[in-house]
């Protein structure tokens, strides 16, 4: 493990790093919006949570919002991006399971968490040389 930390990261063009930040920015924007609308329990959020079979009291919604925003902030900050990506992957797995349990449409609803998770990791791969070094 120590050799990975001391190994020089592979060089990459500025365009790929920029693309990684753009992809990550889209993911961060989506997840931050999702978390923020749960902090202020709007009626559409409450209705969706009820349809999914989750508690709809404001405290539960705010807790869920914090559970989304925390890892999203970790993902946005370079030093903790890997930890944030792992936590968000776990969260998105739970979202996929909830959609699957409800019998939601497969390609548009159920697999949306998979699509978002793939973008999350692709963005991190392009913007984080240490992750590229680890995977080579």
Protein language model annotation of sequence segments:
Residues 2-136:
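Membrane-interface extramembranous regions
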């Amino acid at each position: 493990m120590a050799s990975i930390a001391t190994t020089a990261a592979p060089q990459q063009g500025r365009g790929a790093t920029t693309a990684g930040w753009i992809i990550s920015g889209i993911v961060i924007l989506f997840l931050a919006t999702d978390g923020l609308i749960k902090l202020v329990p709007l009626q559409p959020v409450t209705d969706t949570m009820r349809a999914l079979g989750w508690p709809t009291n404001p405290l539960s919604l705010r807790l869920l919002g914090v559970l989304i925003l925390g890892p999203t902030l970790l993902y946005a900050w370079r030093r903790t991006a890997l930890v944030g990506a792992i936590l968000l992957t776990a969260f998105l797995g739970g979202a996929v399971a909830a959609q699957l349990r409800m019998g939601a449409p497969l390609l548009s609803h159920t697999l949306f968490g998979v699509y978002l998770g793939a973008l999350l990791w692709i963005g991190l791969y392009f913007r984080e040389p240490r992750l590229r070094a680890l995977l080579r």
